[in-house]
Curated annotation (Swiss-Prot):
This is Crossover junction endodeoxyribonuclease RuvC. Mg(2+) 2 binds at residue 66. The RuvA-RuvB-RuvC complex processes Holliday junction (HJ) DNA during genetic recombination and DNA repair. Endonuclease that resolves HJ intermediates. Cleaves cruciform DNA by making single-stranded nicks across the HJ at symmetrical positions within the homologous arms, yielding a 5'-phosphate and a 3'-hydroxyl group; requires a central core of homology in the junction. The consensus cleavage sequence is 5'-(A/T)TT(C/G)-3'. Cleavage occurs on the 3'-side of the TT dinucleotide at the point of strand exchange. The keyword Magnesium applies. Keywords: Cytoplasm, DNA damage, DNA recombination, DNA repair, DNA-binding, Endonuclease, Hydrolase, Magnesium, Metal-binding, Nuclease. The active site is at 7, 66, 138. Its cofactor is Mg(2+). The gene is ruvC. GO terms for biological process: DNA recombination; DNA repair. Its main location: cytoplasm. One of its GO terms (cellular component) is Holliday junction resolvase complex. InterPro entries: RNaseH-like_sf, RNaseH_sf, X-over_junc_endoDNase_Mg_BS, X-over_junc_endoDNase_RuvC. Its EC number is 3.1.21.10.
Length: 180
């Protein structure tokens, strides 16, 4: 099963594609869709087209996107919601089922701790997907979304083959931190 994870943003939308076969997760690609410093409709169109292009290139079976949270600034929340809407429209128009997860669910599924930092997310994504480099925070969050969906949005303790895989490498999660 191929999963496209999306971390929506008006300026930068992260994406990550993974393949899942049983408990095995394989990295396919990741990156960001950057919007030009233009008017809102142009930015939303760029996000929509970027998602549509990813669907044509990678043919995902499923997708996962972060739910909108209420920010301190209501205007920022509205803009984020519009960027998320453009991404969802791209997914739906491409025939890709969409699952939604909160930031808490994402962090619990990937790191095992709901208040994990961006750096902890990046470290765990690198470990779980055996990446040679550290992805940007937006791409790491998108890959994390895909990982979260691959494991039903569950916590690290229910990830089946992932936790034993970390143990074989001498790694574990303690108080939300990856330790060796």
């Amino acid at each position: 099963m191929r999963i496209l994870g999306i971390d929506p943003g008006l300026r930068v939308t992260g994406f990550g594609v993974i393949d899942q076969s049983g408990h095995q997760l394989t990295y396919v690609t990741s990156g960001v869709i950057k919007t030009a410093d233009a008017d809102l409709p142009t930015r939303l169109g760029t996000i929509f087209e970027g998602i549509s292009t990813l669907i044509r290139q990678h043919a995902p079976d499923h997708s996962a996107i972060e739910k909108v949270f209420v920010n301190v600034n209501p205007q920022s929340t509205l803009l984020l919601g519009q960027a998320r809407g453009a991404a969802i429209c791209g997914l739906v128009s491409g025939g890709v089922p969409v699952a939604e997860y909160t930031a808490l669910q994402l962090k619990q599924a990937v790191v095992g701790y709901g208040r994990a930092t961006k750096e902890q997310m990046q470290q765990m994504v690198v470990r779980l997907l055996c990446l040679s480099g550290i992805p940007s925070t937006d791409a790491a969050d998108a890959l994390g979304m895909a990982i979260c969906h691959a494991h039903g949005g569950g916590t690290l303790s229910t990830l089946g083959g992932i936790a034993p895989g970390l143990a074989k490498k001498g790694l574990r999660v303690r108080r939300g931190r990856l330790v060796g």
